[in-house]
């Protein structure tokens, strides 16, 4: 028990700065949403359309680079830190290639908008203009992910936390200056929102490089007379391919997840207004909670990667069990809090009786799946440390799209099982998906430990 308590302390020590970094980055979107709420309706609609296209594409790129965390932590654990710089340099090359592809796709966003929906021509033009400005923030965002993943892989999550908090404050100033009507010299509206993203993401990357400049471990230099400085920075296609091969299933998993929730939101959009609002409130609360297990998962992945690289296999089961204990305690606490204080939470958003009644049901489902959600997200982090990323995609795709979504669809929109339930039916589908995913992931971890 003593060794588990020690490991829980170590995991929490890594989790807290990761959580603060994640919450600060998420808060940027929330603050921008509040600021654009005061713009003209066409501007708000244009940004909403733009974000719905930008989010899944940039998260796909983000997922491709997540392979760097377990890669760096394993090398760090093995003691061969002279191999880390070549991984980082090639991760920047991979980020550059991903950026180019994403920027080309986003530049042609007019094709995507025409394909997925019929948008008002004025809103469509404003959306395209917004996306074509926003796309220039892509390299800055992905380069920041490279250095953040490097720091986390080296058990140094604090730089990302510091820059995340500074970036949040900087974002408030820049966004307010460019978006607000009070500054008549700017007042760029939706265009200002795109320019703000460019400035903030590039600022965060440059600031991150600056504050880690004097860290010997992060900026470790290879001293090899047989390798020239030029060769050191040229792309190594084998390393790039290995990072891509490992990151691709993670990226697909993230893409599957976000597109599922996007599709559910689109299907609910045709229902009564109170159902749409209730769904958005419940989704907002659930998405905020999601950052907690994600932070624990990253911490577990880092610790496991380090000891797998060190070949200290006796520590593996302790780390896995300790991360799951943390998940169990926190998820139970959150579920209890939601059940006890659901009314107070909902009334922060609305006072409408119909919305409160439906949101209450959705939050009770949210409380029901917290334990399963924590186990499956932390389990994903554990599997990433084993570099077992293909199975993550298979489990995510199966549980969400083959099990959860059809079940939710039949409950929400058809009379085949019960009389159609509306939006709440999709939430039962999410519950079934998360139960399925957590069982499959825990079974996979059990198999890996046996090996």
UniProtKB/Swiss-Prot annotation:
<comment type="similarity">
    <text>Belongs to the multi antimicrobial extrusion (MATE) (TC 2.A.66.1) family.</text>
</comment>
<feature type="transmembrane region" description="Helical">
    <location>
        <begin position="130"/>
        <end position="147"/>
    </location>
</feature>
<keyword id="KW-0050">Antiport</keyword>
<feature type="transmembrane region" description="Helical">
    <location>
        <begin position="319"/>
        <end position="341"/>
    </location>
</feature>
<dbReference type="GO" id="GO:0015297">
    <property type="term" value="F:antiporter activity"/>
</dbReference>
<feature type="transmembrane region" description="Helical">
    <location>
        <begin position="282"/>
        <end position="304"/>
    </location>
</feature>
<keyword id="KW-1003">Cell membrane</keyword>
<feature type="transmembrane region" description="Helical">
    <location>
        <begin position="423"/>
        <end position="445"/>
    </location>
</feature>
<keyword id="KW-0812">Transmembrane</keyword>
<feature type="transmembrane region" description="Helical">
    <location>
        <begin position="186"/>
        <end position="208"/>
    </location>
</feature>
<dbReference type="GO" id="GO:0005886">
    <property type="term" value="C:plasma membrane"/>
</dbReference>
<dbReference type="InterPro" id="IPR002528">
    <property type="entry name" value="MATE_fam"/>
</dbReference>
<dbReference type="InterPro" id="IPR050222">
    <property type="entry name" value="MATE_MdtK"/>
</dbReference>
<feature type="transmembrane region" description="Helical">
    <location>
        <begin position="162"/>
        <end position="179"/>
    </location>
</feature>
<dbReference type="GO" id="GO:0006811">
    <property type="term" value="P:monoatomic ion transport"/>
</dbReference>
<feature type="transmembrane region" description="Helical">
    <location>
        <begin position="44"/>
        <end position="66"/>
    </location>
</feature>
<feature type="transmembrane region" description="Helical">
    <location>
        <begin position="247"/>
        <end position="269"/>
    </location>
</feature>
<dbReference type="GO" id="GO:0042910">
    <property type="term" value="F:xenobiotic transmembrane transporter activity"/>
</dbReference>
<keyword id="KW-0813">Transport</keyword>
<dbReference type="Pfam" id="PF01554">
    <property type="entry name" value="MatE"/>
</dbReference>
<feature type="transmembrane region" description="Helical">
    <location>
        <begin position="92"/>
        <end position="109"/>
    </location>
</feature>
<keyword id="KW-1133">Transmembrane helix</keyword>
<feature type="transmembrane region" description="Helical">
    <location>
        <begin position="391"/>
        <end position="413"/>
    </location>
</feature>
<keyword id="KW-0472">Membrane</keyword>
<keyword id="KW-0406">Ion transport</keyword>
<comment type="function">
    <text>Multidrug efflux pump.</text>
</comment>
<protein>
    <recommendedName>
        <fullName>Probable multidrug resistance protein NorM</fullName>
    </recommendedName>
</protein>
